[in-house]
């Protein structure tokens, strides 16, 4: 997911809606991902000038910085990390805030995250390496743009299902309940996924 993307934010909420209402035991993990294609997609969605190279570079850097911020927050625990992500997205998409250090400081002052440790971690090589590993995992799973959702079922670990764009609670529920895969290009079966255990179960379902 793109931590600054409005469509990703909506799809995350659809996933959480599924988790709340599901009969399955669901483990999920939000993984940040960006490349030139996702930046182009973001600019198009925001109706920005895609020919403005300076703006493109600025947005690329901003998304990367937000991804590192999320990884740094996660180092202080899964719950604080997700709280940071959701508050960041809420401020951007509901209050039209710009992503900058002022917003980060404001968020950090209101959640249970050590600010000094956060900034030290964010600037560290370890966080950058962790993010690069996320990118590698996403690429191995054939993720090319955001939002994307990869679903694994513990009863059949040889493949996962990649859902691009059309991520709704209803669609996820249909897939998890064993209904025929929707006949649309957004749904793909991934055979012999090598990254499954590395990702620590993006989404696992157990009845």
Where are these regions (language model features)?
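C-terminal cap of thioredoxin/glutaredoxin-like
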Residues: 1, 15-19, 95, 102-207
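Short pre-active-site segment immediately N-terminal to redox-active cysteine/selenocysteine motifs
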Residues: 1-7
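Alpha-helix N-cap/loop-to-helix initiation residues
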Residues: 7-8, 127
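Structural alpha/beta surface segment adjacent to cysteine/selenocysteine redox centers
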Residues: 9-96
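Short, conserved alpha-helical segments within structured domains
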Residues: 84, 100-103
């Amino acid at each position: 997911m793109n931590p600054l993307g409005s469509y990703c934010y909506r799809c995350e909420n659809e996933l959480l809606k599924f988790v709340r209402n599901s009969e399955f035991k669901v483990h999920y993990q939000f993984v940040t991902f960006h490349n030139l294609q996702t930046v182009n997609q973001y600019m198009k969605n925001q109706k920005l000038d895609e020919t403005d190279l300076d703006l493109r570079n600025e947005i690329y850097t901003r998304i990367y910085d937000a991804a590192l911020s999320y990884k740094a927050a996660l180092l202080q625990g899964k719950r604080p990390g997700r709280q940071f992500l959701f508050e960041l997205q809420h401020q951007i998409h509901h209050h039209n805030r710009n992503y900058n250090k002022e917003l980060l400081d404001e968020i950090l002052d209101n959640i249970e995250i050590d600010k000094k440790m956060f900034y030290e971690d964010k600037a560290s090589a370890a966080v950058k390496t962790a993010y690069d590993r996320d990118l590698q995992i996403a690429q191995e799973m054939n993720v090319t743009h955001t939002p994307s959702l990869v679903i694994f079922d513990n009863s059949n670990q040889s493949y996962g299902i990649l859902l691009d764009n059309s991520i709704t609670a209803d669609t996820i529920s249909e897939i998890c309940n064993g209904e025929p895969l929707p006949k649309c290009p957004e749904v793909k079966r991934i055979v012999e996924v090598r990254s499954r255990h590395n990702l620590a179960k993006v989404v696992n379902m157990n009845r």
